[in-house]
């Protein structure tokens, strides 16, 4: 994973919005948010998450990369092509999904379909968003809910069945 560099705790928003202490955590279970600094973007967080995953597992022979974002810096091309341009996956197919909350589930369905049909063996899903760059500072309904961050998930074929492995990098406390 990769997270926005600025840590914003609930007490900051509760003070700003004149809310009672503990309101955000009590209603949402969220204790803090990670906000991208000025030099961080959806694309840079995606590439950082990819690098962090590559430090944990080999990303050789990736044949399909799916990117998911709702907040890419440019209207086009898709985040997937920014990843393709800035990484080394010469034989991979790339597709970009413009999706929010359901995006990871949509990407999992595409990954499963590609693997089940034997079209792909190693699929990389990269999700990345920087909602703080779009949500107004005074938006009391949405601002407490969203952090900026990215994840990179490797899905691959395994002849023995399903295996879930957990490799986490740059984990926030």
Spans of model-derived segments:
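Short glycine-rich or small-residue beta-strand-to-loop segments that form or flank ligand, phosphate
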Residues: 64-70
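A structural motif shared across PLP-dependent enzymes of the aminotransferase-like
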Residues: 12-19, 44, 71-81
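Solvent-exposed, charged/polar functional surfaces in cytosolic regulatory/catalytic domains
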Residues: 23, 52, 82
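Acyl-thioester C-C bond-transforming condensing/cleaving domain
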Residues: 55-59, 73-173
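Phosphate/pyrophosphate-binding loops at sites that engage ATP/ADP/AMP, CoA/4′-phosphopantetheine
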Residues: 49-63
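Residues within alpha-helical segments
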Residues: 43, 47-50, 108, 112
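Active-site pocket-shaping loop/turn-to-helix segments
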Residues: 28-48, 71, 95-102, 142-144
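Condensing-enzyme catalytic core mediating Claisen C-C bond formation in acyl metabolism
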Residues: 1-38, 139-173
